């Protein structure tokens, strides 16, 4: 009778898939039509919305920061912290229309949360992927 070898990463893979799905859902909520709806709800002009959405294309510049942060140091702690802050910044965008603040303060908070979220996303994404990939043996990658 053959016994199955215990898979130590089964739970981690399930949690990774759940985290990736949540991250994807949040990323959808801060782009396209959803972003346009939020900006119109807080009274931002279309011109300012266009400028902010083009900021995403500058993300490669912030990925360079990750090289210096991840250089020869453990990434688990700071990647987890920055990734949580990144997702929190994106999620907080949706509470701005619900808060009773001045028009200018709502726009300021929106810009601060959006830019912070995108900057942190670009800083943390590459080291996070490298860390997650290092948890899986080379010959087992790609199979769930």
Residue ranges and their predicted role:
Residues 1-70, 76-80, 86-94:
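Helix-loop boundary and gating motifs at the non-cytosolic
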Residues 29, 72-73, 99-103, 135, ...:
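Membrane-interface elements of multi-pass transporters and channels
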